[in-house]
Amino acid sequence: MGTTKVTAPLIFAISVATIGSFQFGYNTGVINAPEAIIKDFLNYTLEERSEPPPSSVLLTSLWSLSVAIFSVGGMIGSFSVGLFVNRFGRGNSMLIVNLLAIAGGCLMGFCKIAESVEMLILGRLIIGLFCGLCTGFVPMYIGEISPTALRGAFGTLNQLGIVIGILVAQIFGLKVILGTEDLWPLLLGFTILPAIIQCAALPFCPESPRFLLINRKEEEKAKEILQRLWGTEDVAQDIQEMKDESMRMSQEKQVTVLELFRAPNYRQPIIISIMLQLSQQLSGINAVFYYSTGIFKDAGVQEPVYATIGAGVVNTIFTVVSVFLVERAGRRTLHLIGLGGMAFCSILMTISLLLKDNYSWMSFICIGAILVFVAFFEIGPGPIPWFIVAELFGQGPRPAAMAVAGCSNWTSNFLVGLLFPSAAFYLGAYVFIVFTVFLVIFWVFTFFKVPETRGRTFEEITRAFEGQTQTGTRGEKGPIMEMNSIQPTKDTNA
């Protein structure tokens, strides 16, 4: 249980799984660069079909639909996670849904040749469905195959895959690469290649040992996989912990989404999970990238698109930093630091945006605030909400919890994308004050309600929530408060 050995089979399995995270990031960012070119495609295609030419309102609506339909697919996919992982397992589920990525990529890649707006929109919907499923599968699989002492560091690799995907999409979208009138279908269809690579590699990755033992009762196979992944023969304590959880599961009824909100021992962790997902999407990170190009242009940057890519590089670098910090500082501490730093930068951005017309040097202050804001995001609110959900729940409720948390993330992402342009139009630079208020609310919630899970087994975390529920009915202070410490469980194998 206390192993910190990093083995080749473990790294291989996690790397293959994070291809799904890369796909999510890539398909999130890929639509932005060729916006003008795709609008021209929509206009040309509709003109060929009918007279009179399409109105600007229709074109804007179709473009908005092409962008937003991705999030709609993500909502549906994220809420369907449990349907796959409980029936097929974690690894097989990732393998099966790559068919969606290939189908969606083909539709988008061939939409120009077919002169079909419908193929583009349907392809975005299907790829959104795929990415929504991946946002549940990947953190769950990584969390279940990782040693307790390294679970947070490996869990952060999910976010690293996402930001690398966004960065690659930004780079490929440059006019000198694939962001041209002729090559943009290849830019969208590129998602087929990672899907094929993952399909080829997944058969060589083991199934989650927790799924095999707890769900399938295949103890020997689970033990063999743990020994191979962790590079140690001494996995008896971990196997016993899984067997104890399996026994508890057999005495409980199957956990549904409604049960998560009804049962006292699940209610607090699911509320924490939802709030952490909201803290990611309502932090203002999308607003920062929305404003960044204009700010870089005002500061005299000749090619603001390259500066935006630079912000993406900062995004990636600080996600790597988070990988090394999360097991040292703890999830809760990093999330608090991230939220606090972002709140300060939001205020600084508001002030500098309001004054940059009067003081030209304020544009450089604003650029600095943007880069630091992005860095703080990747230290806490970026990576932590994805993998901490898997830590807060046992094997039984975990799929349903991942579905609810993922759906709340996708839904809030969709709403921010829908409402932010109007908010920015009416509020201008003051829009960041709204995000500052959200960040302060989430900081307070995290400080008082979010436990530290570093170094604790799934069973220990679950028992702590159950203990709080039981003692809470007697008006006593529950043991979950002890988890707000950043001290990990002592290594009993030492």
UniProtKB/Swiss-Prot annotation:
Annotated D-glucose binding lies at 159, 280-281, 286, 315, 378, 386
User: Where are the membrane-spanning stretches?
Assistant: 11-32, 65-85, 91-111, 119-142, 154-174, 184-204, 270-290, 305-325, 332-352, 364-389, 400-420, 430-450
Inhibition and activation profile = Deoxyglucose transport is inhibited by D-glucose, D-galactose and maltose. Galactose transport is inhibited by D-glucose and maltose.
Instruction: Say yes or no: keyword Transcription regulation present.
Output: no
Extracellular side, ranges: 33-64, 112-118, 175-183, 291-304, 353-363, 421-429
The way it spans or sits in the membrane comes to:
Multi-pass membrane protein
Q: What are the boundaries of the region Important for selectivity against fructose?
A: 277-279
Q: Where is this region: Disordered?
A: 469-494
Gene Ontology terms describing biological process: D-glucose import; D-glucose transmembrane transport; dehydroascorbic acid transport; galactose transmembrane transport
Q: Which Pfam families match?
A: Sugar_tr
**Phosphothreonine occurs at which residues?**
232, 492
Provide the Gene Ontology terms for cellular component: cell projection; membrane; perikaryon; plasma membrane
The chain residues annotated with the modification Phosphoserine are 485
Instruction: Report the function annotation for this chain.
Output: Facilitative glucose transporter. Can also mediate the uptake of various other monosaccharides across the cell membrane. Mediates the uptake of glucose, 2-deoxyglucose, galactose, mannose, xylose and fucose, and probably also dehydroascorbate. Does not mediate fructose transport. Required for mesendoderm differentiation.
Full protein name:
Solute carrier family 2, facilitated glucose transporter member 3
